[in-house]
From Swiss-Prot:
Family as reported in the entry's similarity comment: Belongs to the MurCDEF family.
Name this protein carries in UniProt: UDP-N-acetylmuramoylalanine--D-glutamate ligase
GO molecular function: ATP binding; UDP-N-acetylmuramoylalanine-D-glutamate ligase activity
Gene source species: Borreliella burgdorferi (strain ATCC 35210 / DSM 4680 / CIP 102532 / B31)
Top class in the EC scheme: ligase
GO BP: cell division; cell wall organization; peptidoglycan biosynthetic process; regulation of cell shape
Pathway: Cell wall biogenesis; peptidoglycan biosynthesis
Annotated binding of ATP, by residue: G118, T119, K120, G121, K122, S123, T124
Record bears the keyword Calcium: no
Amino acid sequence: MLLDEIKNLNFLIMGLGLNGGGVALSRFLLKRGAKLVITDLKSETELALSIDALRDFEDQIRYVLGKHDVNDFKNADIVVKNPGVKPNNKYLKFAKRIETDISLFLMFNKNPIVAVTGTKGKSTLVSLLYQALKEKYPGVKLGGNIGVSPLSFFDQLDGKSPLILELSSWQLQSLENFNPIISIITNVYNDHQNYYLNFDDYIIDKSKIFVNQTSGIVIIQDQAYCKYFSKFKSKVRVILFSEFNPCDFDQDIFYCNEGKVYFNDSLIGSFSNSRAVFIIPKVITFFVSYYLNIDLNRTGQILSNFKGIEHRLEFVKSVQNVMFYNDTASTIPESTVLSVKSLKTKDNRINLIVGGTDKELDFLSFSKIADIVRTWILIRGSATVKIIKILEKSSIQYFLFDSLRDAVNYAFKISSPGDIVLFSPASASFELFNNEFDRGLQFKNLVNNLG
C-alpha cells in the first residue's frame, strides 16, 4: 500500500484506548483523507480524553462505543486492531485485512530501526539508547510500547537517522517481515499467560524481532538465548550479553563486572556502578554505542548520570525521612524481586506494597526477598490471593487493604525515619485502575498529600 492510497480506503480502528496510540493512528489516517470508524468496548465517558484529542476531525469520524458491530468489520477495507486484542477475537474473522499501528508504520518507514523487546527493562533501555544515540544522530526518534506511537512523528522522519522502537510481544505478533538493523532481547520471564495459550507462543512472538533480520546484529541475554532462542535461525550475527557471569556458549558475548564492560573478555570501557535494576539496560547501551562508534566517554557519562524513568523504581519524595518509590511498571514477580534487591539496606527497612490483577503467574520467586522485606502490605485483587498463599505457607505476616489509599496510609503510619516504602505490585492493574500508569500516578498523588 502507498501513502496516497489511504484516502481511498475505509479503515476501522478496533480499540481507541487511553494511552495515545489510537489517537496518533487516527490522526495519521485522517490527515491523509481516510474514511474512519472507531470502535471500542469502553464508553464515551471512559474515552473522553482520547475523543477530545480528535475533536478537530469529529466530522470525519463515526464512533461505535460500548460495543462492536459485525457489519463495521465486514465493510472495512482494513481493520487496525489494538495490539492487546487477541488474534482469535470473534470480530476479526470478518475482517478483510488486519493491521496494527506498528505494521502500518513499517509499510511507509525508511529510517533504520533499533528494535528492543523483552519481558522487563525495555522502556529503561530505549530511554538510555535514545540519550546515547542522540550524541551522534540528532534526528533519532523514540517510539512504540513506551507510549509514543511512531505514527505521531512520521512526518518528522528524515529517512536516515536511527529510530528506536520498543516492542511488546503483542506488537511483534503481527510483524511477518520485520527487518531492523539492531534487534535486542533484554530478558525473558513468564508473563502474559492470561493472553497466550502457552509459554512457547510467547517465545515465538518475541523471536519475530530478529528471525527476518538481514543485516546488522542481534543482541540477546545469554540465558534466554540458551534456553529459548538458539533454536531459531538467525541470518545475522548474534551477540550475547550477561549481567555478571557469562553462560558457557560458543558465541560473541559482552558483560559487566563492577562497572567495567568487556566484549569477548577485552575491556571496552566502564561506567559508574548503579542499582541492579539498571545494570542490564546500561551495559547494553554501552555496547550499542561501541558497535555504532559513538563516543564511549560521553556514553559513560550519560549512564553514570541516569536516574531512571517514570514509574520504574522512581523516587517520589521523602516524607518525614521516609522514602517512597513508585515501581508500578513491575507487573511480574521477578521484576518486583529485582526492585527490592536494588533498594536493599543493611537492616532490611523496606515496607512493600504489592498485589493486583492476576496474569496466570506464580509468585514462588518472592521467597528470594522474604528476609529483605520488613512489612508486606497487600492490595486486594486476584493475584493477591496467590501472594497470600505464598506468604502464609512461610508463616509471613501481611496486612491486607481494599484500596491503594489505605495501603499507603498504613505504610506511612508504620514507617520510621530511614525506612523505604516501595510500591511494586508484581501484578496487572485492571481491577482498580485504568492501567499501570494510572496506578502509578494515583500512588504519587497519595504520597504527595502525606505529611
